[in-house]
Amino acid sequence: MNRILIIAGGTGGHIFPALAVARELREQEVDVQWLGVKGGLEEKLVPDSFPLHLIQIKAFRGKRGLQQLLMPLRLVRAVFQAYRIIRQFKPDVILGMGGYVAGPGGLAAWITRTPLIIHEQNSIPGLTNRVLAKMAKFILQGFPDTFPQNRKVITTGNPVRTELVKMPLPQVRLAARRGPLRILVLGGSQGARSINQKMLAALSSYPRSEEIAVWHQTGQRDFEFIQKEYEKIKIEAKVDNFISDMAGAYGWADLVVCRAGALTVCEIASVGVASIFIPYPHAVDNHQFHNARFLEQAGAAIIISEESLAETDLMRWFEQFAQDRDRLLTMAENARKLAKPEAVQRVIAQCKKFYAAR
């Protein structure tokens, strides 16, 4: 049986694409194991059916003083932990999908001479993948032009969940839809306080509340507060701290208001739905803005910077979209044209080149 070690952790933006690949690999009877970080989100999200190995590592950026001095020692420890796991499992190939774990995992792959493939989800590559790109056999990218083109660079798209790829086309879902404008609000897996606050401010002053329905993912921190506030402003709203049924949520929505993480952008393209992006302003290298531009330039999305965001901006867009369903449909169709539904298979095709090659 062929063996693959997947390296991914930290955030849903790394874990969910890796899970999409892992599930398809398991369908193909590949032995898949997972390398993550102790205390990371992967401990909650990776199913028990995938053996999960955990090492100890934290982010390098932003460390000062003693913490900064200790980072080299901690990196060496993490590389050694990953090295032992790789030597024990003996994978045919290692697939790095990002997160803090990718650095030590990728270095351990190089030390053990195990073929390494990396996948960069964002439009601007992170520091870890820029380093690992020199060691990797192939560099897979979710967006075109993330890395300079050479023989190792392949644009696969970002893997998304199968249930999203299989959703009906925008024309089927939206063409005959009537009733309130359905707004899906997402702040990423952890929620986004600024989006939560601006949404409430915009909707509390919206003149015709019957025109709006909301499904709002708040994150755990703001859940109870946001739920109570919707009750006060008399807007039809479903409030969740985390939405697990994303196919149901996207299928329900006419419009998505969200951050611009790579996974969210590619899910929106895969489904085909109009969006307003509010990129996280502190993202490394401003990569969320560049992710969002991928859809905005195609006429599929609106970008509003958080620095200039006012509740009147959101209210104005909501009023326009409530009166112009045709524009929503056009934006949704433009998004769908950019989808790469075969992304999972493209990633796996590169992994197959190293099956039983050792």
UniProtKB/Swiss-Prot annotation:
Reactions performed catalytically: di-trans,octa-cis-undecaprenyl diphospho-N-acetyl-alpha-D-muramoyl-L-alanyl-D-glutamyl-meso-2,6-diaminopimeloyl-D-alanyl-D-alanine + UDP-N-acetyl-alpha-D-glucosamine = di-trans,octa-cis-undecaprenyl diphospho-[N-acetyl-alpha-D-glucosaminyl-(1->4)]-N-acetyl-alpha-D-muramoyl-L-alanyl-D-glutamyl-meso-2,6-diaminopimeloyl-D-alanyl-D-alanine + UDP + H(+)
Record pathway: Cell wall biogenesis; peptidoglycan biosynthesis
InterPro entries: GlcNAc_MurG, Glyco_trans_28_C, GlycoTrans_28_N
Any one cellular-component term (Gene Ontology): plasma membrane
Record-listed UDP-N-acetyl-alpha-D-glucosamine binding positions: 11-13, 122, 161, 189, 243, 262-267, 288
Record-linked SUPFAM superfamilies: UDP-Glycosyltransferase/glycogen phosphorylase
Recorded topology in the membrane: Peripheral membrane protein
Chief localisation class: membrane
Family membership noted in the UniProt record: Belongs to the glycosyltransferase 28 family. MurG subfamily.
NCBIfam families tied to this protein: murG
Role played: Cell wall formation. Catalyzes the transfer of a GlcNAc subunit on undecaprenyl-pyrophosphoryl-MurNAc-pentapeptide (lipid intermediate I) to form undecaprenyl-pyrophosphoryl-MurNAc-(pentapeptide)GlcNAc (lipid intermediate II).
Record-given protein name: UDP-N-acetylglucosamine--N-acetylmuramyl-(pentapeptide) pyrophosphoryl-undecaprenol N-acetylglucosamine transferase
Organism of provenance: Coxiella burnetii (strain Dugway 5J108-111)
